[in-house]
Every structure is written in C-alpha cells, then in structure tokens.
Swiss-Prot record:
It is found in: Cell inner membrane. It is a multi-pass membrane protein. Gene3D superfamilies: ATP synthase, F0 complex, subunit A (1.20.120.220). Key component of the proton channel; it plays a direct role in the translocation of protons across the membrane. GO terms for molecular function: proton-transporting ATP synthase activity, rotational mechanism. The gene is atpB. The chain crosses the membrane at residues 29-49, 84-104, 114-134, 140-160, 189-209, 210-230. It comes from Rickettsia prowazekii (strain Madrid E). Its main location: membrane. This is ATP synthase subunit a. It comes from the Bacteria.
Length: 242
C-alpha cells in the first residue's frame, strides 16, 4: 500500500487549526499553494522590477506569458477584455506554478485536488455572473435563451442552458484536477516500472523516463492554458452578450 501511486495526493495536517467549529488546518497543500504564490511574485518581481531596453531572458519569458494572456483576452473578448488582464494573468501564473511545482520529486500537486481547482473555477464563475449583471442588468438572463429559439422550445432551452451554465465551474475544475492526477499517477507507475527494468536493462529505460517527464511538463503548461482560455470564453459571455 505504501507504493500506491495515489499516496502522493494525501492531505497531511501540519498545524491543526480549528476556527468557529471548522477545520482550517495548515496542510501540505497550503504550503505548496503558498510556495506557488511566493515563487510567482518573486518571478514577476525579478522580471519586471528593473526592465531594460535589451531585456534579460527572465524579462522576455514574463513578457511572453503576459502577451499570451493579453492575446487570449483580445481574441475572445476584444478591447473590452483589457481590464481583466490582471485577474486572468494572475490565475494563469498561479495555476502554472502549482502544476510545475508538482513535477519536483517528493512534492505535492495542489491542483490535483478538486477543492483547489473548484475554488479557482468558482472565482471565475462568480466574476462572470457579477460582471454580466452589472453590465447588462436583467438582460443578462437572455444568455439562457439563444436568439431565434422557437417559443414552444424556449422552456426546454432555458433549462438546458441554465444547467450548462451552472455546470461550468464543475467541468472546469474537474478537467484540471483529473488531468493533473492522471498524469502524476501514470508518471509514478512508469517510474516504478522503470526502476524494476533497470535491474535487467541497466540505464536503457532512463531516456523513456526523461521523455515522459518532458511530456508531463508540457501537460502542466497546457492545462494552465486550457483553464485560462476557457475562463476568457466565459468572460466573453458576460461582456459581449449574444
């Protein structure tokens, strides 16, 4: 049981804290989320604090990420999406660092837990809903009735669209958590298998392990991108009501 690939996802209490009857203990998940936040802020500080005409590699990498997020908002929302750059950029950076931290040996992947990803998805869901009502008022409810829907079909379409809308934070959070968990389980299983193979094949399985780790890093970046691009699409529904 100690070799189970799922043991890496166990939540461990480090500081037991009770508040108003609720368990708000400081856990290994808390540490890695705090570490991801600290590393994100440090990275951005070092990249942008002393900007130069001829940028450093760190500055170039940060500008690439910033432009990526800005392009996502521009392509999905247009010029009106610029005001959401701080929110979406912070979201992307945080998820990216959480995902990448999980790739380090004996670490913990915070984004493999649904409570973490659902909280992030709920933040986007509430932002979209609030922005939609502020910008369009009651007209925002027309989002649940596609234009041109026949009157006799309207009640069914409203129910379907409302259910789809309410399911957004669930699907968004499950997608990220499931992909991160599946990837790490696969990596753990193949790593254990590779160690066994090394007894007979010496160092031959190592290149396979390197390729797999590289693929997992790609998946970590891709999942942060997918979460962010879907968030931009949801924001577009609130701003450019169709």
């Amino acid at each position: 049981m100690t070799h189970s690939p799922l043991i890496q996802f166990n939540i461990k209490k480090l500081i037991d804290i009770k508040m108003f009857g609720f368990d708000v203990s400081f856990t290994n998940s808390s540490i890695y989320m705090l570490l991801a936040t600290t590393l994100s802020l440090t990275y951005l500080y070092l990249a942008f604090y002393n900007r130069k005409l001829i940028p450093s590699r760190l500055q170039v990498s940060a500008e690439i990420v910033y432009n990526l997020v800005a392009d996502m908002l521009n392509q999905n929302i247009g010029i009106k999406g610029r005001k959401f750059i701080p929110l979406v950029f912070s979201l992307f950076i945080f998820i990216l660092f959480c995902n990448l931290l999980g790739m380090t040996p004996y670490s913990f992947t915070a984004t493999s837990h649904i409570i973490v990803t659902f909280t992030l998805a709920l933040l986007i869901f509430l932002t979209v809903t609030i922005v939609g009502f502020i910008k369009h008022g009651v007209s925002f409810l027309t989002l649940f009735l596609p234009h041109g829907t026949p009157v006799w079909l309207a009640p069914l379409m409203i129910v379907i669209e409302l259910f789809t809308y309410l399911a957004r934070p669930v699907s968004l959070s499950l997608r990220l958590a499931a992909n991160m968990m599946a990837g790490h389980v696969l990596l753990k299983v193949i790593a254990s298998f590779t160690v066994s193979l090394m007894i007979y094949l010496k160092f031959l399985p190592i290149p396979l392990m390197v390729i797999l780790i590289g693929f997992e890093i790609f998946i970590a970046i891709l999942q942060a991108y997918i979460f962010t691009i879907l968030s931009c699409m949801y924001l577009n529904d609130a701003i450019n009501l169709h």
